[in-house]
Curated annotation (Swiss-Prot):
Quaternary assembly: Homotrimer. The subunits circularize to form a toroid; DNA passes through its center. Replication factor C (RFC) is required to load the toroid on the DNA.
Gene3D superfamilies in UniProt: 3.70.10.10
Superkingdom of this protein's organism: Archaea
Family: Belongs to the PCNA family.
GO BP annotations listed: leading strand elongation; regulation of DNA replication
InterPro entries attached to this UniProt entry: DNA_clamp_sf, Pr_cel_nuc_antig, Pr_cel_nuc_antig_C, Pr_cel_nuc_antig_CS, Pr_cel_nuc_antig_N
Keywords: DNA replication, DNA-binding
GO function term, MF aspect, one: DNA binding
The protein's role, per its UniProt record: Sliding clamp subunit that acts as a moving platform for DNA processing. Responsible for tethering the catalytic subunit of DNA polymerase and other proteins to DNA during high-speed replication.
UniProt xrefs under PANTHER family: PROLIFERATING CELL NUCLEAR ANTIGEN (PTHR11352:SF0)
Disulphide bond pairs: none
Name of this chain's protein: DNA polymerase sliding clamp 1
Amino acid sequence: MRIVYDDVRDLKNIVETLTKFIDEGLFEIGQDGIRLVAVDKAHVSLINIELYKELFKEYEVEDEFKFGFNSQYLAKILSIAKRKEEISIESDSPERVKITLGGALNRVFIINNIQVSPPEVPEVNLEFEVKASLSSKAFKTTINEISAVTDTVDIIAVEDKVILKGEGKEGSQIENEFSKDTGAISDMEFKNEAKSPYDVNYLSDILSLTNLSDYTRLAFSTEKPLELEFNMEGGGKVTYLLAPKLS
C-alpha cells in the first residue's frame, strides 16, 4: 500500500479536528479511496470522512488496509509539515505504517498500526427544510464571534437568508446574516422557515474543516440535526452531523 498527497494541509486540518472527537481512529483504505467515521464521546456529533483516490497524486492499494492511529500522535507528526509539502503513507506489513513528509528535508516516521474497532453507527436518513452553501470564511468568523458571548447558536432560515444568532448574559447579543446579496451564500434550497439551537462549542471544534473548501454546505430543519458538508477540490468530502441543543 502506498499513497501520496501533494499538499499535507488538508490532512492536517482533518486530523486536527479528529483530536477533538476521538483518542484513536481508523482509516479504512480501499481501492476507491479512504474512509473514516467517528462519533464523539457524548454521542452528540458524528464525522464522516471520504477521500476519493482521485484526490491523491499516487494511489496504489491492492487490498483493503486498515490504519489505526492515535489522533494526538498523528496530529503532532503532521504539525511538523510545512505549507504545501507532500506526504506519503505506505506499508508493506499490517503492523507498521511509514509516513514521509517531503520538502527541503525528507522526514520519515515509522509508527505502529494499532488495533481500532470502527464505531457502530446507525443509518441515518434525514430530510432538510433548508440547504445553503455559506462562505466558509464568514461561517468561521461568525462561530468564533458567537462563541465569545454564549454557548448556544440559533440557526434561522427565512426565504433567501440564513441567520446565525447568539444571546449572552446581561442582554448581549450577536446576529450575523448570510444572503446571496452579500455573497455570503452561493446557492440555497428553501422549503420552509426553520429555527434550531446548537451547541456552539461543538461547531468551534470543527472550524479547521472550513479550510477545506471556500463554501460550507449547511442543511437543517427545526429542532433537527445540523449537517455541514465540506467538499474538497479534486475529490473528497467531510460531513459533520450535530444534534440540536434542546432543553
